[in-house]
Amino acid sequence: LNANLSTRYEAPAVKAFNFAEKSGMLYYITAGDKAEEKPGLYLLNTETGVKTLIKEGDGVFKQVTFDEDGANLAFLYCAQKDSCYKAMSLWLSQQGAPATEVAARGNRAFPKGWVISEHGKLQFSKSASRLFFGTSPEPRQKDTLQLAENRPNVQVWSWDEPVQYTVQDYNKEKELKRSYQAVYHINGGRICQLADEELSQILLGDEGDAPLALLSTSRPYSLSSMWEGRTRSDYYTVS
């Protein structure tokens, strides 16, 4: 409802919606109806009443994200629910225009065998010139054709592993969802993989607009930290 325009907006079968932080832009995802509205992701300017179908589809939308002013909208999309773990693609809408795909599985910037992660956080830099997203090695899937009682349940751990078994077990679910930072440079249309399995931790400066990012890893010191009682790290910069 826009009181200034005395206008009421309605949409059928809405699954999710949200507003931009500093504007009247609203997105919503709908299953649609047979009469008027197609299924997909819509953008509504509540100040002017203009509605745009950003991406048509009844697949899976995730991480739908505005920039601060609502001029850009990014999201992950997969046409098939069962393929989200390996077939997510990154889409971007600028200035209210229909979205275009900017990254997908097999992109040359990704390490071989890596995909866009459905668990990675999607975010714009402060200036909205960069779009950060997550990638990961393609997750392994369980063999659903084999009965659980026929699967061996053996856990092997060596005393000199860098991470203790109890810690591995505690962090298992977190590790399965781990993603690694990548960035899409909106103005140049260029993608860069910033973090990877060797340098997994990243710190962005100036709200994502800094010319350098700080990468770190504590992996070389994981074993010694067991008796030292503290964790050391190596630090690197990436531009």
Describe each region flagged by the PLM:
Residues 1-239:
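Beta-propeller folds
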